[in-house]
UniProtKB/Swiss-Prot annotation:
The gene is lipA. GO terms for cellular component: cytoplasm. Keywords: 4Fe-4S, Cytoplasm, Iron, Iron-sulfur, Metal-binding, S-adenosyl-L-methionine, Transferase. HAMAP family: Lipoyl_synth. Pathway: Protein modification; protein lipoylation via endogenous pathway; protein N(6)-(lipoyl)lysine from octanoyl-[acyl-carrier-protein]: step 2/2. This is Lipoyl synthase.
Amino acid sequence: MSKPIQMERGVKYRDADKMALIPIKTVVTERQELLRKPEWMKIKLPADSSRIQGIKAAMRKNGLHSVCEEASCPNLSECFNHGTATFMILGAICTRRCPFCDVAHGRPVTPDANEPEKLAQTIKDMGLRYVVITSVDRDDLRDGGAQHFADCISAIRAKNPTIKIETLVPDFRGRMDRALDILTVTPPDVFNHNLENVPRVYRQVRPGANYEWSLKLLERFKEAHPDIPTKSGLMVGLGETNAEIVEVMRDLRRHGVTMLTLGQYLQPSRHHLPVQRYVSPAEFDEMKAEAMAMGFTHAACGPFVRSSYHADLQAKGLEVK
């Protein structure tokens, strides 16, 4: 029997190294096996990248992270060029090892106690009016990182009194009661937690997560804060069917979720789960129509949609696709 790999604290495991640590089998995708990207998935890069470099410099200066960079988001250039970013707190090393995600896995370091103040000042310097705060999973912390979220919310509001804050939280596995007790005292303006995909493929896509647990987290926050929008999203193209997506949408509505995002999964590297299909813009439009008919107050559905993509516009109920 082989000995378990001893991970050094603070070291990032990515791509092949990360996949080797996953308890499910993943197969490297050969070039000839890759699905050809359709025309609607082609991205145009901005001619001027000075704003992009400015945001990256501000992040580096303050030791901050963006999920845009860490997760290799396809919208990075567009969002950074418009002066928006989704900040990722609690470090850049995740205790989970989902095979769809490009965020590094490993043993995280102790959270930076100064991060809330640095984050708040950076947001003020950038002049942001709407901000999304997310994090890696921190199963090593007794509250899953909930207090750090609360500290960040408080610090941001102290320096930016009129700002709107959306949190994209992990599932706080095994720590839901403690986490919700903390977040109830300092709630965000929008509470977001992504289901990511349909329950049939959870073991393959989200090892270590539980579909019902995630639904319960969303439901319990909504019960505690009925006037605060709750939000969730899925990435499609991982083997699910459109009918299964619609059923997940029904589950979300049954658990009080009011905002929805649906976007196309893109394989970060050939070591990650492969794209099994590209969903057409017309199909996304049909799913949006279904969502609105179910009673969602807002549904952003399109190939490049991500949960924080133009999140300020989503919160205002404006169309994003």
